[in-house]
Amino acid sequence: MSGRMKEVVSWSPEEVTNWLMENAVPEYCEPLKSFTGQDLINLTEEDFKKTPLSRVSSDSGQQLLHMIETLKMAHHIEAHKNGHVNGHIHVSVNNTAHENGFSSKTKLNGVPNGYKKEMIKIPMPEPERLQYPMEWGKTFLAFIYALFCFIFTTVTISVVHERVPPKEVQPPLPDAFFDRFDRVQWAFSICEINGMILVGLWLVQWLLLKYKSIISRRFFCIVCTLYLYRCITMYVTTLPVPGMHFKCSPKLFGDWESHLRRIMKLIAGGGLSITGSHNMCGDYLYSGHTVILTLTYLFIKEYSPRRLWWYHWLCWTLSMVGMFCILLAHDHYTVDVVVAYYITTRLFWWYHTMANQQVLKEASQTNLLARVWWYKPFQYFEKNVQGIVPRSYHWPFPWPVLHRGRQVKYSRLVNDT
């Protein structure tokens, strides 16, 4: 590294690109592809207010500017260190000069008369490593929380199923959507297929994320809090089946061994009707399928490059079509889908707003968001994450990829909606 520092001003564009890749800012490779080392160290804040640099990151280039300052400092230190080699330095003045009454005649050791020079070691900071610590132990705890909520949800569904009134006694409630659209039998299968596609896309995207530990913690915390809320709403108010087409499994009337087998079957099938594991009734308010369709889209969009607009639109279409098919199949009341969408989007936005603003991670009289019941766990999971998590990607496997494109990191702009 030191040999390279000495020649930073003479770097070629290829060397600048290599430096950007090594320092985990590959998103600047394209806009700076023709920059030399001299061009790189001459960058200012004004340059990041103009295109194309203004489109790369929402921090106005502060991270890269900080790294350039560190690079210039290291280059400056190396230059002075070279000047002290063999006990003398290079000076651009005559051997004898007078300044403030002192003689500045150069001595053998290279130090002018009346002055003392020392080399000071300035540590090179590595803010990115400290700013986004992985903390896999916390991620494991979030996974345990997710596992608990998933199991608890299946238990709640089994309990609520016993309380659902027979459809012959309590017919479906009136619903404006059902009045306007006849039931389409295969629509719910389309919903579940769309959901599986979105989950699959999110898993692939997650594998390629650089900060997958932080992001997976957020996903586990949000999705399981949503399902915990769902357990409460579907238990306190048991709605009748939305349609006469429902064929609910027989009630068990306290047979806990059969309850356990039914719970294990539901867990094994992922809670999906398409796998034949979900034939219970009562889990209507609110829709778990809508939660997954909405949340996977939100995470896909939040942590993928902005330039992949077609990818965002594809996932949005899959999500919206899936929710429409839930209603078209008459498998949920409209209120189930509306409430699920509202709660999912608000919790996602609240959580990320709090995570992206350092001041909201500290409880105070003016921080009303600190009054939510999950604030303490939130502080525990997010306290060491400093700022917005970059949309950075890397190849996670030990074997090289044949045609590896440039890595991209994007941060959401302030005015993004």
UniProtKB/Swiss-Prot annotation:
- Record Pfam families: PAP2_C, SAM_3
Q: Domain of life, per the record?
A: Eukaryota
EC number of this enzyme: 2.7.8.27
Top-level EC class as recorded in UniProt: transferase
Which ranges carry the SAM domain? Answer: 11-74
Q: Which UniProt keywords apply?
A: Apoptosis, Golgi apparatus, Kinase, Lipid metabolism, Membrane, Sphingolipid metabolism, Transferase, Transmembrane, Transmembrane helix
Q: Which GO terms describe its biological process?
A: apoptotic process; ceramide biosynthetic process; inflammatory response; negative regulation of apoptotic process; sphingomyelin biosynthetic process
Residues of the active site: 289, 332, 336
Q: What is this protein called?
A: Phosphatidylcholine:ceramide cholinephosphotransferase 1
Q: What are the leading ranks of the lineage?
A: Eukaryota, Metazoa, Chordata, Craniata, Vertebrata
Query: What's the name of its gene?
Result: SGMS1
